[in-house]
């Protein structure tokens, strides 16, 4: 997968069965199944298989004493979903409940993963996050 595979954002709705259409541009990269888990900032992280494996490997490489909580957070809330013939995935009720995602969502490309946000929360995040804050953060990590 190219690093720029998951970019942009798209508004969608989750149907009454918890299904979400993946945007066509992103669907071509994920294959027939996706891994999802509770993300940071109350979103859902969605990975294709290779991306999920890399994510798990990076978590497991952390010192054990510091990684236990992160491993439980991500693996304990993880789920696997097939991508159906219409390009839909099913988001488990448990993940929707814990992230506050109900109907209207924004699907966000985050380079190596897709993030699924409640649209109101995504809009709020964008309003609160300005370029100077991002610039300061990047300076702190030596970028």
Language-model features, listed with the residues they occupy:
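Short hydrophobic beta-strand that contains or immediately precedes a catalytic carboxylate
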Residues: 22
């Amino acid at each position: 997968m190219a690093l720029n595979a998951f970019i942009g954002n798209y508004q969608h709705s989750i149907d009454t069965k918890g299904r979400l259409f993946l945007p066509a541009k992103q669907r071509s990269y994920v294959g027939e199944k996706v891994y999802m888990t509770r993300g940071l900032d109350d979103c859902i992280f969605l990975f294709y298989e290779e991306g999920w494996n890399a994510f798990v490997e990076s978590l497991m490489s952390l010192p054990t004493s510091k990684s236990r909580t992160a491993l439980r957070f991500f693996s304990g809330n993880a789920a696997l979903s097939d991508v159906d013939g219409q390009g839909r995935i099913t988001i488990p009720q448990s993940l929707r409940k814990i992230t506050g995602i109900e109907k209207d969502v924004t699907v966000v490309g985050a380079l190596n993963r897709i993030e699924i946000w409640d649209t109101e929360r995504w809009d709020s995040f964008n309003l609160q996050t300005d370029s100077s804050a991002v610039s300061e953060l990047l300076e702190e990590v030596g970028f």
